[in-house]
Regions:
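Positively charged n-region of N-terminal signal peptides that target proteins for export
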Residues: 1-5
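C-terminal edge strands of extracellular/lumenal beta-sandwich accessory domains
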Residues: 23-43, 120-143
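Extracellular beta-rich ligand/substrate-recognition surface
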Residues: 48-58, 103
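Hydrophobic beta-strand segments within beta-rich accessory/binding domains
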Residues: 61-79, 121-124
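Exposed aromatic-hydrophobic patches
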Residues: 62-63, 107-113
Length: 143
């Protein structure tokens, strides 16, 4: 009986793990969808992406090395219907550095044209959500 139970546990986990990962993948698909119109405007969308899950009012910092002279866009999405998310870009001194910000339901974005080359921080926040935790994904690009 114990052996049978031990064999069933990995099978049960194997069926749950892909489902859990699929939601982050859904958020990534939505983030790429948000970035698509900007690719038509000449942005090169990077393959780099970040994701995870956050509770309401929780934040996650994502670091990116940005270069003076380029214009960058960051696009954030969640797969949670009814969730409101935001992304804001800060410089290494902690000052808000974005030149544009938008938010529409499960999507958000920010643009920045850095004054200097260096580390910048995209702060992802779940402002509200019908769920305890919401999956999110962030992509970025430049032109």
């Amino acid at each position: 009986m114990k052996l049978r139970l031990l064999l069933l546990i990995p099978l049960a986990l194997a069926s749950v793990v892909p489902f859990a990962l699929a939601t982050v993948n859904d958020a990534l698909s939505f983030a790429k969808e948000a970035a698509a119109p900007y690719a038509k405007q000449g942005y090169t969308i990077r393959e780099d992406a970040w994701g995870g899950d956050l509770g309401v009012k929780d934040q996650q910092a994502v670091t990116a090395q940005l270069f003076k002279g380029n214009e960058y866009g960051f696009w954030l999405a969640t797969d949670t219907r009814g969730a409101v998310i935001t992304v804001h870009i800060y410089d290494s001194d902690g000052k808000l550095a974005e030149t544009e910000f938008w938010q529409k339901g499960r999507f958000a974005g920010a643009k920045i044209t850095p004054n200097k080359t260096g580390a910048y921080y995209a702060i992802v926040t779940v402002e509200k959500s019908p769920q305890e935790r919401s999956n999110w994904a962030l992509v970025y690009g430049y032109r």
